[in-house]
């Protein structure tokens, strides 16, 4: 388990290794939230399916072997984690724009995660993946619908790629 803070302690990021399966994901969420908050909050979901807890902005992501959570009382947040595999390379036409010519797996994974993070951050807009433009070199995404630029943080390991952002 790892818990870190960002933006002058206004954001908390948690990462936990878990077993496979839906039950392990839910148990992992509860363990991680307890470690982050000192209690297990009630998680509700809004009409878009986005998780909500009282007093915090929250985003949750799962991938094989991991659960990641980001919390903030002050900022809207988004997070995504993806295990390293060539799965995203097979579907680049679904999420990469013609002006995002990422050919290496690392860049493709970062672009995928950054777009998923951005989608969560702007959940009320229901953005299509083609309505976001990623600059992997600058850790930057543009929401093309509302012309808003955001910076994202990325972490790349041999097991996973993690991105998160706030606004």
Protein language model features and the residues they cover:
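Core catalytic alpha/beta fold that binds nucleotide/phospho-ligands
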Residues: 1-167
């Amino acid at each position: 388990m790892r818990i870190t803070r960002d933006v002058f302690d206004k954001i908390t990021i948690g990462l936990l290794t878990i077993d496979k399966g839906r039950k392990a994901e839910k148990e992992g969420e509860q363990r991680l939230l307890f470690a982050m908050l000192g209690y297990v909050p009630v998680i509700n979901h809004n009409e878009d399916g986005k998780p909500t807890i009282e007093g915090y902005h929250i985003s949750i992501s799962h991938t094989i072997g991991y659960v990641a959570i980001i919390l903030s009382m002050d900022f809207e947040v988004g997070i995504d984690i993806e295990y390293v595999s060539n799965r995203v390379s097979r579907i680049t036409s679904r999420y990469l724009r013609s002006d995002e010519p990422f050919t290496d797996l690392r860049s493709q994974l970062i672009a995928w995660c950054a777009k998923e993070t951005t989608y969560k951050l702007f959940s009320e807009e229901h953005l299509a993946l083609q309505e976001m433009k990623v600059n992997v070199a600058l850790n930057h995404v543009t929401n093309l619908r509302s012309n808003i630029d955001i910076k994202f943080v990325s972490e790349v390991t041999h097991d996973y790629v993690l991105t998160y952002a706030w606004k």
